[in-house]
């Protein structure tokens, strides 16, 4: 079979860009904003990267071990690709990192300090010669938690390589090796903004103060241009907004700009991730000292994949947290104003245990940023309902189905559903055949119900499942009803203690 070449090209174009999943944004999320919103880059995170982010940090390709795993054999391929992508699309580029206690070449530990210093200088100089326009550089990464000084990092089984001695070791300040690293960085990268980067700082005031001690040493020599806090999910989750902001304030008191450098928001369930994004991200973005935020991956396959930190699904669909993020950054959030619940087939009755009824929620306005809802049913011993709104009858009775908006407004919609079980009928004649309703149509809401000797409960519902009136503990054969309602079609539910039945009535 032959296929038109143009059609084939269009097919593969759509496939390669992910447009089968969802239309791509025209510009990066933070385009035109006073602070950047970026992401870690790797081959696995490359697809449509420039459509979302205006800042790029190579996740692993710019680390010393990735570039010079074998001594004197430089592999620049990954960093070249990252740098080229950033420059092509006008994205801010940040080198990550120069000095760290992890992911440095394994061979560095076997050298004497003189040779180590020579190799460090060579690493700096070759970077500077090859990449002349790096806006930001993480000079030292994780000095408190993962230093190249022979320490045993938290959770590790082996001590780090000690090449800090080649940079002066602890020295008089306790942090001479950090200061030397920044002096070297200022020498080789005079036009780049130099950053000190660390994790799990802002969840602890004690750690924040220790971090500031190093920062002030660097400030004294005019060596540091910004403060990096990774702000991974394991730092922010469980830490109050008050404490996060208070520690950001302490860092800001140094007078330096702050960069949240490796942010991720966990959540295998969309509503969980959205809730945490709405809680954490505004603390960062709205802080006057924060000048940029970098997510540590956004696609499936990122480093916290099992925790669900990705913002775009495998199918290329943006998760609600990402949709909210874009709207928040651009101040275009539209909150829900109403939620209406109905069944997809218009029914308000499930007449057999184990049967299902598909529910739907209409969220208005139609352009609500987050139109998703959470489904619940009460009492829960009578029915269950799943995340897609499929109600399953468990026991006879009346349940209230509720749809609650995810957008934080608390908007809810409800509908009552009657559950009966035709197999429990005790009369040879169907319950509905024993009951008469007249006149039908009813004028001005006046009508009479006969044949209700066995009936214990009568309820009147409108077409969207809203209960209008109810009569309980009945012990009579006739009931005269008068209701003040709008003209329309209504449903009368009858319950005899074992089964439900219903009749429609027109009220004029």
Question: Where do the protein language model's features map onto the residues?
Answer:
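Substrate-binding cleft and catalytic face of glycoside hydrolase catalytic domains
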Residues: 51-69, 77-201, 250, 267
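Bacterial Sec-dependent N-terminal signal peptides
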Residues: 1-23
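C-terminal outer-membrane/trafficking sorting elements
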Residues: 367, 372-374, 381, 387, ...
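Aromatic-rich peripheral "rim/lid" segments of glycoside hydrolase catalytic domains that contact
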Residues: 68, 126, 142-171, 184, ...
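Glycoside hydrolase catalytic-domain groove-lining segments
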Residues: 77-89, 171-197, 204-271, 281-285, ...
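Acidic-and-aromatic substrate-binding clefts and catalytic sites of carbohydrate-active enzymes
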Residues: 37-48, 64-77, 104, 144-147, ...
């Amino acid at each position: 079979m032959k296929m038109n070449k143009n059609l084939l090209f269009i097919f593969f174009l759509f496939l390669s860009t992910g447009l089968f999943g969802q239309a791509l944004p025209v510009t990066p999320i933070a385009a035109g904003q006073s602070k950047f919103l970026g992401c870690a880059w790797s081959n696995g995170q490359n697809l449509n990267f420039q459509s979302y982010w205006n800042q790029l940090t190579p996740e692993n390709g710019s680390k010393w071990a990735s570039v010079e795993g074998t001594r004197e054999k430089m592999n620049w391929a990954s960093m070249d690709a990252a740098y080229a992508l950033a420059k092509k699309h006008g994205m801010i580029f940040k080198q990550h990192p120069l000095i760290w206690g992890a992911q440095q070449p394994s061979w560095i530990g076997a050298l004497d300090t003189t040779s180590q210093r020579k190799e460090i200088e060579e690493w700096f100089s070759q970077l500077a010669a090859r990449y002349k326009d790096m806006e930001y550089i993480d000079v030292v990464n994780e000095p408190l938690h993962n230093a190249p000084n022979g320490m045993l990092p938290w959770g590790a089984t082996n001590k780090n390589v000690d090449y800090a001695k080649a940079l002066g070791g602890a020295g008089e300040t306790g942090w001479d090796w950090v200061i030397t690293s920044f002096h070297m960085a200022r020498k080789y990268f005079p036009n780049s903004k130099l950053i000190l980067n660390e994790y799990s700082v802002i969840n602890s005031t004690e750690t924040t103060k220790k971090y500031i001690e190093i920062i002030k040493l660097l400030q004294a020599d005019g060596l540091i241009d910004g403060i990096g806090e990774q702000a991974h999910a394991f730092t922010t989750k469980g830490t109050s907004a008050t404490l996060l902001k208070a520690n950001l304030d302490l860092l800001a008191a140094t007078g330096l700009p702050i960069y949240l450098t490796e942010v991720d928001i966990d959540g295998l369930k969309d509503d969980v991730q959205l809730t945490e994004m709405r809680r954490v991200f505004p603390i960062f973005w709205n802080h006057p000292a924060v000048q940029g935020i970098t997510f540590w991956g956004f696609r499936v396959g990122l480093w916290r994949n099992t925790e669900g930190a990705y913002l775009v699904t495998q199918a290329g669909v943006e998760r609600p947290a990402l949709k909210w993020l874009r709207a928040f950054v651009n101040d275009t959030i539209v909150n829900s104003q109403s939620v209406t619940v109905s069944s997809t087939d218009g029914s308000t009755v499930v007449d057999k245990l184990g049967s299902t009824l598909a529910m739907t929620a209409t969220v208005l306005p139609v352009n609500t940023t987050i139109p998703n809802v959470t489904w619940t049913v009460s009492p829960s011993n009578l029915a269950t309902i799943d995340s897609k709104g499929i109600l399953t009858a468990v026991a006879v009775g009346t349940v209230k189905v509720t749809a609650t908006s995810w957008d934080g407004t608390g908007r809810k919609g409800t509908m009552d559903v009657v559950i009966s079980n035709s197999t429990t009928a005790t009369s040879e004649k169907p319950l509905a055949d024993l009951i008469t309703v007249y006149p039908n149509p009813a004028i001005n809401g006046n009508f009479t119900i006969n044949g209700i000797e066995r009936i214990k409960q009568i309820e009147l519902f409108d077409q969207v499942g809203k209960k209008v009136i109810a009569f309980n503990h009945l012990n009579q054969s006739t009931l005269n009803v008068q209701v003040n309602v709008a003209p329309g079609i209504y449903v009368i539910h009858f319950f005899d203690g074992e089964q439900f039945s219903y009749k429609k009535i027109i009220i004029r």
